[in-house]
Amino acid sequence: MTTVRQVYEAMQVIAPLELAEHWDNPGLLVDCGGAVHRVLTALDITPEVVEEAAAKQCEMIVSHHPVIFDPLKRLGPQDVPFQLVRAGISAVCMHTNLDAAEGGVNEVLAGIFDMKDMEAFAEGCGRVGAIEEITVPQRVDADAHYAAL
């Protein structure tokens, strides 16, 4: 049985929290505990995403953007963290740490362009490198390849 904590720890191996920018709020932001059999991934956790996760019987959502970013001053039914707890769905959010991670967001984007001599900048949150000349049809074919992965 896979637990919330195990999924969270696995995500930290991929994108250690130490890579996050000081202003960011990544991590296990809503912990309902228990077993995880199904996970939904999303860029942002919105009320619609929570509804979809509940409909698909997911116990966890892994998102890029933090579901809690600013300090909470109140919590009510209109708030996504409240909706997650009510549905029993945990939330792991990996933002700038996933941007900066080896094999993370920016390395995947660099890979789409087949970037050469790639190096990190902005404390790891970006990548810069050389690309070869490419035509629009070649780019479309390459994008179709990545979309199929």
Where are these regions (language model features)?
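Hydrophobic structural segments
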Residues: 1-149
